[in-house]
A protein has these predicted regions:
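Glycine- (often His-adjacent) and acidic-residue-rich active-site loop
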Residues: 47, 55-90, 106
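Hydrophobic alpha-helical membrane-association signature
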Residues: 31-34, 83, 113
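Glycine-rich beta-to-alpha active-site loop
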Residues: 90-121
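Short secondary-structure boundary/capping segments
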Residues: 5-7, 89-92
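Phosphate-coordinating loops and pocket residues in cytosolic domains that bind phosphorylated ligands
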Residues: 26-29, 62, 71, 116
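Conserved phosphate-binding and hydrolysis motifs of nucleotide-dependent enzymes
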Residues: 19, 25, 57, 63, ...
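Conserved CoA-thioester-binding segment of acyl-CoA-metabolizing enzymes
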Residues: 1-56
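Hydrophobic/aromatic residues within transmembrane alpha-helices
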Residues: 16, 53, 65, 113-115
Length: 121
């Protein structure tokens, strides 16, 4: 199962779905990489006018996946990765309208993502 789903409809609305419902959509490194790819794709595809974020299951996003904390990169590597691929900066400065459809748990990164969006529902 893909941890993040991506689609674009005929109206130019991209939907990015956090798809780890058993883990309450906690964001792991694979999801972070996919979110970056999909943000960039939405920026490059001229037909995309809006991006809607949603979470599958009973939570929007419970934050970072703490099961990966023990295998996390060093502090310097983490800072470099955040600088090179800053998801929140990309979202705050995206050319498209961004909307978070929030429900259930929204903690940590699961609250940061909606706060970076233009609209929260």
């Amino acid at each position: 199962m893909d941890p993040v789903l991506f689609s674009i409809d005929e109206r130019g609305v991209a939907t990015i779905t956090l798809n780890r419902p058993q883990q309450l959509n906690a964001i792991n490194m694979a999801m972070r990489d996919l979110l970056w790819e999909y943000f960039r794709a939405c920026d490059e595809i001229a037909e995309v006018r809006a991006i809607v974020f949603r979470g599958d299951g009973r939570a929007f996003c419970a934050g970072a996946d703490i099961s990966e904390f023990g295998t996390a990169p060093s502090l310097m590597d983490s800072r470099a990765a955040r600088h090179d691929r800053d998801l929140w900066w990309e979202l705050l400065n995206h050319r498209c309208l961004t909307i978070a459809l929030m429900h259930g748990f929204c903690y940590g990164a699961g609250l940061e993502l909606p706060l970076c969006c233009d609209l929260r529902i």
